[in-house]
Amino acid sequence: MKTKGALIWEFNQPWSVEEIEIGDPRKDEVKIQMEAAGMCRSDHHLVTGDIPMAGFPVLGGHEGAGIVTEVGPGVDDFAPGDHVVLAFIPSCGKCPSCQAGMRNLCDLGAGLLAGESVTDGSFRIQARGQNVYPMTLLGTFSPYMVVHRSSVVKIDPSVPFEVACLVGCGVTTGYGSAVRTADVRPGDDVAIVGLGGVGMAALQGAVSAGARYVFAVEPVEWKRDQALKFGATHVYPDINAALMGIAEVTYGLMAQKVIITVGKLDGADVDSYLTITAKGGTCVLTAIGSLVDTQVTLNLAMLTLLQKNIQGTIFGGGNPHYDIPKLLSMYKAGKLNLDDMVTTAYKLEQINDGYQDMLNGKNIRGVIRYTDDDR
């Protein structure tokens, strides 16, 4: 079928909304009418080249929610009319990682940047006569998509789509970074550095886990104000102010758990994050840097002598088929504030405006809300 999609044709160029053609669902595939897509910083990394796909053009978008319209042969766990969320990490449940309980590290994830279908290695989307590389096997910046069932999670149909799409990446990643990867325990002091969608979700995770103090570090003033509404106890504009403030509040003990959720991770900043990490504490690097950045500034002696831990994480260490429904059930129960994380809704044609707003610090999370005009 022919529809629209937001593409990039080369690095550092605006998104181009234009006609694309999507194939019909094959074995184990699901066709979805998209209703909402989250505008995550990781898609901007496609533009800058910090996270390059295997080729161009690229169809962006890896957070999304919609309605199943058609299923391919062999699909018996989804049916037309189902409300679903797209998980940016596929999960087969069968590979060694999935069997070991690390479904966020599923072997199917090896193809996240390759653009080839999990089903048969083909390209299922074309534009201007060329194969299109969809972000993380999805490409939610289009009002329709065909995707392998391993990336699809059924949800409660009463959950608004603009909220549901956030748990496909940002909310699950942030919340899981706190409660699972950092393993925040009651009474822990926690610092969150960077307050976009992932950071605000990590903040809520720390509060939910029973943190004593939650220190939020963010240069944008209105985001610091929002952090207080989400449960932060102290806010600081930068890491130097946080160093002094956290030292004063904790009598020099610092934060047992530090979670880094800045827009782009820079190796030169890692040592500064460890200065606010307590002895024996853990610094979780949730943010991602350039795939070619191999330089890290780190005081190795202090890392050893103070027994500090640096831990990477993807998808918050979670299981998409478990965590996505669980987090949405918490939202329904009033235990997770997702409504206030959606700052602005955009049309697909406004995607460049949305990303400029993100870069200007105006959004916690922008969302593309699809209409009939987009289709």
Swiss-Prot record:
Q: Which residues bind Zn(2+) 2?
A: 92, 95, 98, 106
Please name the top-level EC class of this enzyme: oxidoreductase
Q: Which CDD domains match?
A: Zn_ADH_class_III (cd08279)
Arranged from A to Z, the UniProt key words for this protein are: Cytoplasm, Metal-binding, NAD, Oxidoreductase, Zinc
Give cofactor(s), names only. Zn(2+)
Record-annotated residues binding Zn(2+) 1? 40, 62, 169
Q: Name one Pfam family in it.
A: ADH_zinc_N
Instruction: Quote the cellular component terms of the Gene Ontology held in the record.
Output: cytosol; plasma membrane
Molecular function terms from GO: alcohol dehydrogenase (NAD+) activity; S-(hydroxymethyl)glutathione dehydrogenase [NAD(P)+] activity; zinc ion binding
The record's subcellular locations are: Cytoplasm
EC number per UniProt = 1.1.1.1
Cofactor: record remark: Binds 2 Zn(2+) ions per subunit.
- Major localization class: cytoplasm
The GO biological-process annotations, alphabetized, read as: formaldehyde catabolic process
Q: Which reaction does it catalyse?
A: a primary alcohol + NAD(+) = an aldehyde + NADH + H(+); a secondary alcohol + NAD(+) = a ketone + NADH + H(+)
Top-level taxon of origin: Bacteria
Similarity comment: Belongs to the zinc-containing alcohol dehydrogenase family.
Q: What is this protein called?
A: Alcohol dehydrogenase B
Species whose genome carries this gene: Mycobacterium tuberculosis (strain ATCC 25618 / H37Rv)
